[in-house]
């Protein structure tokens, strides 16, 4: 009466009512297995993003009288068997029974047992799915699990793994927060989760210790029996790669890392993906492995499924409107051995490039500046192994293509397009395969070459554009369109692979690894990852550890970028206002330039109060301090860049003809774009306000101001960038019209109101602000008010300016005088 799914754990499902059973036999008892789960689909606001890992742990199956128990083993602590302390290994360390199910049937020999699978998988026995909410949380919340609506989505069984995909449904009849547009009905949320039970790998794999100077994902363990100052015993996550013949300088591995390109992949892209995968062999050949990585094509009539963990696959799937691509891998929780990986690439990463891109600039709300500033714990960037390279890269590719068409770098031929897509897709595949080899992001790698070097096509052809494929690279337009992407492993990648995979004798392993890692201060091997960068957040201290930047002088790169954007805007109509074209295309390309402008402004602020951070250890090559304050002249260059391009009275001046041709798409789509668009005309003031808002709030963020103050006494030179200089320069440029006795344009009027609001926030948030910042905020407001009074006596300004100045003066008066504020 049951559908049978044979595999690692046999699974049975009643054809009549769907009730399911899991078979445990004596071969399973008293053995350890790996449990792994991730979101197959979900809703961002519910914390369930597609592809996000839920966790990996070791479970043990035992029989207790008439029950089958599943316990979770604690893998976080190591006890050396030679130490007497190992006798207390289980003391105060929890190994809980998370599942205990009554045996409901057994065979005559009592070697096979059936238990209720519904009680295991149709609830949260293995893993908590619903998020926990802190007291006072007012965001979107999932309701209670609905037993009647939670059901199996798919069951897949293979010799090495059993996968159970469950559609969990949560109900909240009266939600206080209804969430965003992706939530169809806020009362009911469905989340798709895959549970995997996996056979524990058994081989002679030898784990390798982690070193913080090199970026690998790790399996964390603490050695409880060591007397060393630091008891971390973390292992890097890597594949079991061993030479067939260790006596040869170059040998094939016993078992190569094989990637299967799924048969859903378009024919014209298969060789591109193969190129991206096998380009990693450059790094492996340098350490003696021939054909360490092999890419094969999955046959159209293949009898195996990509979900079978015996096959590493690059999967091509449909996710409309997304440039999603991710390269997750799975590691043994005991030792970090990688045993399975799947790279998923959304078809829209390539297909959307051929279309007119959505605009991704939205108007700013009036109170957003205050909300952003008060949010001192700005959103982490790519925390805990997540990767959003592909979604941003598709936008960069769109902008880069249009820029090259306008500046003549490419002619737009079919051959140009093929070459462009080839390079971009190889770049993406290299990045995602790098993750599956165990490598983390390296957001400092793009800083190793100068603008001059990157502008030389002979140099970029030979060396590429970056030190690593694990950075987030913009399309590099500096050499005129010759080398646009990073299409081969860089020097950092070669070094990291050497540390993780070069084969050594056990006797000198640790010495050899230390010799490799101690080269971390070499200029070509710089490394900084997610928790060093934090995107553009004020938590990131190193301006060279950044995403979507380029060169050893990012400010010079940003200047070139903004010049290119302005050139694009100036020539946009000449290139794209052609018969048969659409005004939506013009609007989209214009918005792509806005996106570049926004990111440059916010990223440049990292130089203010910035600190170069090195992960080196004492005694490393070219010994240097971990922290080096950014020299004052570089901080001034960055501040001047922001002032001139974002806050100056001449910073923004758009062609009215262009603005009147930025028409949106009028065809309806599945997202109701036409109906949800707030304004069909282009909201230029709101967009400019957003461009100015991000660098403004970032400059005045409590963390940044605290670092500026601290750096004043950490600097070893007489030339010091001081908080006084920051406040004075920003004040002078934002309020420059008062000195010049000129009219204040509409963009500047909005900026000045934001500036007053920002200074007010500093003044009345004394707990989080340095005392000097509070004092400077008050003196700034007083000085601005005095200059407004002087300017109001000038009768040569327009009515807009007079009204604005009167409003600003009253606003500042209420801020400075508590009695007025109370009244």
Residue ranges and their predicted role:
Residues 1-265, 283, 287, 298-415, ...:
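Auxiliary tRNA-acceptor-end handling modules of aminoacyl-tRNA synthetases
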Residues 15-16, 52, 230, 263, ...:
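Soluble non-cytosolic domains of exported or imported proteins
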Residues 37-39, 276-277, 357-360, 449-454, ...:
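Short secondary-structure boundary/capping segments
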Residues 77-79, 83-106, 110-127, 409, ...:
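An exposure/low-complexity boundary signal
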Residues 257-295, 431, 435:
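Secondary-structure-rich domain cores
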Residues 278-289, 319, 434-435, 439, ...:
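Sec-exported extracytoplasmic/periplasmic mature domains
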Residues 297-317, 422-479:
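The catalytic-center signature of Zn2+-dependent metalloproteases
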Residues 415-420, 445-823:
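Conserved catalytic/binding loops enriched for acidic/polar residues
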């Amino acid at each position: 009466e049951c559908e049978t799914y044979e595999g690692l754990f046999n699974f049975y499902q009643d054809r009549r009512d769907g009730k399911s059973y899991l078979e445990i036999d004596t071969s399973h008892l008293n053995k350890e297995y790996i449990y792994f789960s991730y979101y197959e689909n979900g809703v961002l606001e519910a914390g369930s993003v597609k592809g996000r890992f839920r966790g990996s742990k070791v479970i043990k199956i035992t029989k207790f009288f008439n029950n089958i128990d599943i316990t979770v083993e604690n893998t976080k602590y190591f006890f050396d068997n030679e130490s007497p302390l190992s006798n207390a290994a289980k003391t105060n360390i929890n190994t809980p029974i998370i599942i205990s199910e009554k045996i409901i049937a057994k065979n005559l020999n009592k070697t096979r047992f059936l238990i209720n699978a519904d009680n295991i998988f149709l609830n949260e026995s293995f893993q908590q799915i619903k998020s926990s909410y802190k007291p006072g949380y007012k965001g979107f919340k999932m309701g209670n699990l609905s037993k009647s609506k939670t059901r199996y989505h798919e069951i897949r069984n293979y010799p090495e793994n059993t996968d159970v995909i469950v559609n969990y449904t949560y109900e909240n009849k009266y939600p206080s927060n209804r969430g965003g547009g992706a939530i169809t009905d806020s009362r009911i949320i469905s989340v798709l989760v895959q549970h995997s039970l996996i056979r524990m790998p058994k081989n002679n794999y030898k784990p390798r210790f982690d070193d913080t100077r090199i970026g690998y994902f790790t399996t964390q363990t603490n050695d409880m029996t060591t007397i060393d100052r630091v008891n971390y015993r973390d292992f890097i996550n890597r594949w079991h790669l061993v030479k067939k013949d260790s006596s040869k300088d170059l040998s094939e591995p016993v078992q190569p890392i094989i990637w299967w390109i799924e048969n859903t992949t378009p024919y014209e892209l298969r060789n591109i993906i193969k190129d991206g995968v096998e380009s990693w062999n450059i790094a492996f050949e340098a350490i003696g492995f021939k054909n360490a990585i092999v890419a094969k094509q999955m046959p159209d009539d293949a009898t195996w499924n990509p979900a079978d963990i015996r096959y590493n696959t690059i999967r091509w799937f449909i996710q409309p409107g997304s440039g999603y691509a991710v390269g997750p891998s799975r590691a043994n929780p005991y030792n970090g051995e990688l045993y399975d990986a799947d790279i998923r690439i959304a078809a829209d990463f390539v297909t959307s490039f051929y279309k007119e891109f959505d605009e991704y600039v939205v108007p700013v709300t009036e109170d957003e500046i205050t909300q952003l500033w008060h949010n001192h714990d700005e959103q982490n960037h790519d925390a805990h192994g997540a990767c959003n390279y592909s979604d941003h890269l598709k936008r960069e590719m769109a902008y880069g293509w249009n820029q090259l068409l306008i500046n003549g770098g490419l002619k737009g031929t079919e051959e140009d397009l093929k070459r462009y897509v080839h390079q971009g897709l190889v770049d993406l595949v290299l990045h995602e395969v790098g993750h599956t080899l165990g490598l983390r992001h390296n957001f400092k790698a793009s800083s190793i070459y100068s603008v001059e070097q990157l502008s030389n096509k002979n140099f970029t052809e030979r060396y590429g554009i970056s030190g690593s494929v694990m950075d987030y690279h913009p399309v590099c337009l500096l050499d005129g369109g010759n080398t646009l992407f990073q299409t081969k492993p860089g020097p950092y990648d070669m070094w990291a692979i050497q540390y993780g995979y070069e084969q050594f004798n056990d006797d000198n392993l640790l010495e050899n690894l230390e010799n490799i890692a101690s080269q971390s201060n070499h200029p070509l091997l710089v490394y900084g990852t997610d928790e060093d960068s934090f995107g553009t957040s004020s938590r990131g201290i190193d301006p060279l550890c950044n995403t979507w930047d380029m060169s050893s002088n990012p400010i010079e790169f940003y200047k070139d970028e903004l010049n290119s954007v302005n050139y694009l805007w100036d020539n946009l109509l000449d290139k794209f206002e052609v018969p048969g074209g659409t005004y939506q295309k013009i609007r989209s390309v214009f918005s792509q330039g806005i996106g570049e402008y926004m990111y440059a402004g916010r990223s440049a602020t990292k130089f203010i109060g910035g600190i170069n951070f090195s992960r080196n250890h004492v005694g490393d090559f070219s010994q240097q301090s971990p922290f080096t304050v950014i020299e004052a002249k570089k901080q001034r260059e960055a501040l001047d860049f922001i002032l001139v391009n974002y806050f100056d009275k001449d910073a923004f001046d758009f062609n009215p003809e262009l603005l009147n041709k930025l028409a949106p798409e009028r065809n309806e789509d599945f997202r109701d774009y036409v109906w949800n668009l707030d304004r069909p005309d282009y909201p230029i003031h709101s967009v400019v306000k957003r461009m100015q808002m991000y660098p403004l709030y970032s400059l005045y963020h409590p963390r940044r101001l605290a670092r500026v103050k601290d750096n004043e006494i950490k600097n070893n030179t007489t030339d010091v960038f001081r908080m006084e200089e920051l406040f004075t320069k920003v004040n002078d440029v934002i309020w420059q019209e008062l000195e010049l006795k000129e009219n204040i344009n509409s963009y500047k009027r909005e900026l000045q109101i934001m500036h007053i609001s920002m200074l007010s926030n500093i003044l009345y948030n004394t707990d989080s602000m340095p005392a000097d910042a509070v004092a400077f905020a008050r003196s700034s407001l007083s000085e601005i008010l005095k200059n407004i009074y002087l300017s109001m006596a000038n009768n040569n300004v327009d009515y807009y300016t007079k009204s604005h100045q009167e409003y600003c003066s009253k606003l500042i008066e209420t801020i400075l005088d508590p009695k007025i504020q109370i009244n």
